[in-house]
Amino acid sequence: MTNWRDHILKEFTPRVERLTVVADPDGLLLEEKILEGIRDRGFELLTFDDHIEFRYVYESRFRSHWDRGDQTDLVVVLRSGADDLASLPYDLFHAGRKLSFNLGDIFPNLSYPVVATLNRGYLDVLYDAQKRHSPGNLGENATKEFILRHVFEIAPELIKQPSDLLRVLLRLHYQGQQIPDVLTARLIQLLRKSNHFDDWPLETITLDREAFYGFLQERWPIFLSHMTAQGASIAEDDRGVYNLAVKGPANIPFDHHDIRGYVESIFLEGLLQPASLENKDVLYKTWMRIGVKTHTAENKSFKLAKLVSNLDSSVPKDDAKYTDWFHFARGWAEMIVISSDGEVHLHEEVNNNIKNLKGLVDAAFTKWIVKRYAGLINLPPVPPVMLHHLTRYLARHLVNDSISKVALLVVDGLSLDQWLIIREELALQKTDYYFHDSMVFGWVPSTTPISRQAIFAGKPPIFFPDSIYSTDKEPMFWAQFWTDQGFMPGEVVYVKGLGDGSLDDLSETLSHPQARIAGLVIDKVDKIMHGMELGTAGMHNQVRQWAQQPYLRSLIEMLLDRGFHIFLTSDHGNIEAEGCGRPAEGVVADLRGERVRIYPNVSLRA
């Protein structure tokens, strides 16, 4: 076998059995390339999670076609062991070919519970390492260390200096490596044994990305002050002089050759913020310039040129993981913010590079979407990958994390670049706010009735075909989802039309002792967008002005005061575009909005 997927894909030969039932306790068939391989072989895949939802799709999309004599190959996936296949409905169990796959069969010499914690995207590297090194039967700790070394390229015994540790943590957090907690705990345990990092908050900065960036943010000004005073690297430790929120050594070797490249990138993408410095001219011609606060248009243009260059060399490939696009999107959004800043003079070369890059990204993303998007719907909801996963993700938090209350704020029409502006303004108003960013894919087409309803229903749009032109059923979908999770109707709140005005009515609603789950729609950004005539720069200006007003901060503070954990998302974004006027099409289009037309068939669309 050349890779682990061959163990699975060799079992799928089209036109043999129209129904294949698979016991898949480890979710192997839901891995991106497995899904792609199954689809390329002509199979459709359907997970058996909810009896009613499954029966609806099965009867409408497959059973009815089979009854007409049509040939379609269907794979039904049960997320449990082979012994549970008998729990499937009678017609499925007796009509389908039965298969079973699990990680233990693919990695027989490694600890099954440890391997099961690993993100399926890392199984390629692990499979290659298993073939190359042929380990004997490894126990739990030995398996953890094998994975750390050969999958994540972390050799704990070689981490002896601060620069060694920082290199590992920067790669972990900046590249978005998904190391399971059990492996992180083992790494910390081994580092503690070495006694090299007794004063480092390893548990905090290893497990929490935002805490790690906060750790670096506090120490960057200290580094700059030493560099301007001494012109050399820091050797002494003067942590007692500084009041640091994240405990640990005050002096960090940002200028180490293994660290510097990461530091430049995280400043370029806005993950760290430049620091104020009195004698900043000393650093003007050094690499540290990128992390020094200045309001000069020249410095912003310098940052933009470097960011565009970085993005141009890192556009995800055709076979990229969805997480690669998430990572790319953060830098892309930062580029949009800077390039739309009225103070920045776009040199002709940089402007042309941005235009070329936009064309390159549009083509690459479109190609990737055509190839991979259809499989995203089947991925597990934790971590969420698509908008309809969010509601199930919240439910997991309520059940597993002992969170008593959650509030989901859906900012209609908010794009990622505009979120960066809102986040910046909120951080200026409340320095103790703690943000943890992640991304999900919206639904295509990303209209509000389709994408936003998927959030509140917790289901793909196929389950609400009669309401994809309206959002009127959102309150019902939201209440129904939580009722199905075992919550009482009085515990669930849905309010839309937020964004300005008084919060008194909402405050009274959320003050009810039963209120535990709040779905709140903020439509202010969408209203700004629909009235905008000044492009991206105008959007950024008005979104910033709105964020500077007290409304959003007051809403967040009110929710926090009432014990809510806050999750903020968007149903879709927006981009600047040139319109084509208002086509006079009569009743040809089913939906004739100002920015979208929906047609009943391909012929009329053409």
How should each PLM-predicted stretch be described?
Residues 1-406, 413-566, 570-606:
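…; additionally, a secondary subgroup of soluble metalloenzymes is captured
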